[in-house]
């Protein structure tokens, strides 16, 4: 999928991301579906001991990491945690030295920092989609996340 790597002209990429976890914490997986024009790429991965929120973050991080050049990216996520983190909370966390409003360390800070770095490479728009509501891209990302989780469980 060479064309999904971006052509340097700010290619438009649509990205659907999802995370899944059994037990929370427990085995988890992440999935990404990317489309640029007629080209499509899917990715998934997982960890043996993780949380749903960590897998939601990993999906977006890995999806953006796969783009080798700056692109215009629309990210479709069903995660309020990722959506609010990037659109509402991030600026304040950074201003407070990665602390929450009640001065506690931000959970999953290394993933938020990695995501912030990846987002900085691209022009990103965020779109929230209701999970398990028939959005075809979200359904595929969910299936990929479950594949990642099953692989992490050793099945």
Swiss-Prot record:
One of its GO terms (cellular component) is cytoplasm. Endonuclease that specifically degrades the RNA of RNA-DNA hybrids. GO terms for molecular function: magnesium ion binding; nucleic acid binding; RNA-DNA hybrid ribonuclease activity. It catalyses: Endonucleolytic cleavage to 5'-phosphomonoester. This is Ribonuclease H. Its EC number is 3.1.26.4. Its cofactor is Mg(2+). SUPFAM superfamilies: Ribonuclease H-like. Mg(2+) 1 binds at residues 18, 56, 78. Disulfide bonds: none annotated. Transmembrane segments: none annotated. Monomer. It is an enzyme of class 3 (hydrolase). Keywords: Cytoplasm, Endonuclease, Hydrolase, Magnesium, Metal-binding, Nuclease. It comes from the Bacteria. Belongs to the RNase H family. Residues 9-150 form the RNase H type-1 domain. Gene3D superfamilies: Ribonuclease H-like superfamily/Ribonuclease H. It comes from Bordetella pertussis (strain Tohama I / ATCC BAA-589 / NCTC 13251). It is found in: Cytoplasm.
């Amino acid at each position: 999928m060479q064309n999904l790597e971006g052509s340097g002209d700010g290619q438009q990429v649509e990205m659907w991301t999802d995370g899944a976890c059994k037990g929370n914490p427990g085995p988890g997986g992440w999935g990404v579906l990317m489309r640029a024009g007629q080209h499509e790429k899917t990715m998934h991965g997982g960890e043996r001991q993780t949380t749903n929120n960590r897998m939601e973050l990993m999906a977006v991080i890995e999806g953006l990491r796969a783009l080798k050049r700056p692109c215009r990216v629309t990210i479709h996520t069903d995660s309020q945690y990722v959506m609010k983190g990037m659109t509402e909370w991030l600026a304040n966390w950074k201003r407070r030295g990665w602390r929450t409003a009640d001065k506690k360390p931000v959970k999953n800070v290394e993933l938020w920092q990695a995501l912030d770095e990846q987002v900085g490479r691209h022009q990103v728009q965020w779109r929230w989609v209701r999970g398990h509501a028939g959005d075809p891209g979200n359904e595929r990302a969910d299936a990929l996340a479950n594949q990642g989780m099953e692989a992490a469980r050793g099945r």
